[in-house]
């Protein structure tokens, strides 16, 4: 069954699924958050090993590596599409290990993501469906669940913020930032945001502030020693 619901609707460019990491036709494109928003560039990966390297190289961060991992598993399925069923499963199991361990600090959760993709692959093989597309659909469904859960949190968060008030963020909260602003817009509530820069990668200055701006909110970047 093809996924039609998209929980990223109405969010900033940076939070759209295709602009995090996306598999299509034998490639995974990952938005390079190391240079965004000064440059909008995508790193194109043509093997799952290249996806693992991109994750290791901090091309994407926050929740981005988990989406990249799932899309990397879809790419692995494409790589081994001409093999026998047993060979495909062995190849995907090896890819699971490669991608899961791309970044030591995320290995445990990454393994859960990749294991889920492996189960989606097994089901697709039993049903005779294209494995790469089945894994991508699984990844989109996982994103939908996560985004929707965070959206429910945002619905409780927004009423706590006074109209015309001030919110200070920290680092890049990714989905909760976008969903908070989306729910605020739906409620007709406006407020100002201050984003500490977040050294050394400047996630606050580059990512959080850009999401706030893209969604139409007044945002000011401050240095990390200014919040007090």
Set out the residue ranges of the language-model regions:
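Fold-independent oxyanion-binding glycine-rich loops
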Residues: 32-34, 47, 69, 170-173, ...
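Active-site pocket-lining segments that scaffold enzyme catalytic pockets across diverse folds
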Residues: 135-172, 176
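Long amphipathic alpha-helical segments
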Residues: 11-127, 132
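Glycine-rich oxoanion-binding loops at beta->alpha junctions
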Residues: 34-38, 43, 208-209, 213-228
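Active-site glycine-rich loop that binds ribose-phosphate moieties when present
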Residues: 148-155, 177, 203, 220-226
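Short coil/turn connectors at secondary-structure junctions
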Residues: 17, 24-26, 61, 163-165, ...
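Glycine-rich phosphate/diphosphate-binding loop of Rossmann-like nucleotide-binding domains
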Residues: 170-221
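Buried hydrophobic packing segments
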Residues: 69-77, 117, 157, 176-184, ...
């Amino acid at each position: 069954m093809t996924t039609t619901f998209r929980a990223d609707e109405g969010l900033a460019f940076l939070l759209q699924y295709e602009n995090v990491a996306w598999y299509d036709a034998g490639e995974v494109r990952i938005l390079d958050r190391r240079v965004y928003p000064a440059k909008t560039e995508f790193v194109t990966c043509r093997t799952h090993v290249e996806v693992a390297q991109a994750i290791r190289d901090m091309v994407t961060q926050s929740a981005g590596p988990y989406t990249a991992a799932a899309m990397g598993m879809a790419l692995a399925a494409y790589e081994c599409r001409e093999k026998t069923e047993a060979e495909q499963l062995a190849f995907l199991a090896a890819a699971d290990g490669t991608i899961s361990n791309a970044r030591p600090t995320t290995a445990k959760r990454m393994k859960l993501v990749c294991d889920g993709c492996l189960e989606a692959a097994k089901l697709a093989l039993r049903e005779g469906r294209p494995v790469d597309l089945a894994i991508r659909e699984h990844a989109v469904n996982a994103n939908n669940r996560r985004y929707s859960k965070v959206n429910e949190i945002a619905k409780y968060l927004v009423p706590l913020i006074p109209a015309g008030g001030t919110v200070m963020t920290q680092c890049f909260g990714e989905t909760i930032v976008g969903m908070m602003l989306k729910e605020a817009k739906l409620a007709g509530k406006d407020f100002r945001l201050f984003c500490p820069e977040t050294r050394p990668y400047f996630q606050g200055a580059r990512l959080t502030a850009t999401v706030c701006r893209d969604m139409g909110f007044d945002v000011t970047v401050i240095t990390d020693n200014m919040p007090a």
